Amino acid sequence: VSKLDCIKSYLLVGGTALSLQMGTRQSEDLDFMKWRTSKTEKMEVAWYQIEKELAVIGDIQHKDILDIDHVEYLVSGVKFSFYACPKYSPVSMPVEYLNKLRLADVKSIGAMKMEVMLRRSNFRDYYDIYSILKSGVPINDLVSLALTYSGHTLKSKNLLAMLTNSSRFTRDYHFEQLAPIYAVTAQEIEDYIKFCLL
């Protein structure tokens, strides 16, 4: 995968990018994102080119063109997603990882995980934020970057209310399959976040 030309303009984000940098849990899919660099830029995914390259490395079992800017593939049992985000990138320093594979940095991943809480309540996102905080990233840095990344549609008060409401998150059997290194409950994560906010 790291040698594919189609990933050059994208960064690997999400759980897999975090796992490669911190090793706090396994991840199952490869999420690639690119962001707007100018107001006039058309945010599209060149799915035809991507598909041609993915077909070389494995069997394309499923394709889902969700929109002009978002496509997902299942290649030999591995989920790939490519998303051209209309926002500006939260990543100031991409991590050069291997060949053409570049990763979003840990702080940016944390901010994106916080921003996605507007749309979903996955325990793995809550766990990842906990892992990032445990690694020493200050919570105020994450909150500030998340608010900026959301275009300030996310308000500090609302984000902190979401982060300190562990009842939204349930650690399930599926999460256990990801071999998390921290044996924490949602309540323990909430308590730690409150401690970080003191």
What are these regions (language model features)?
Residues 1-198:
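Compositionally biased terminal segments of proteins
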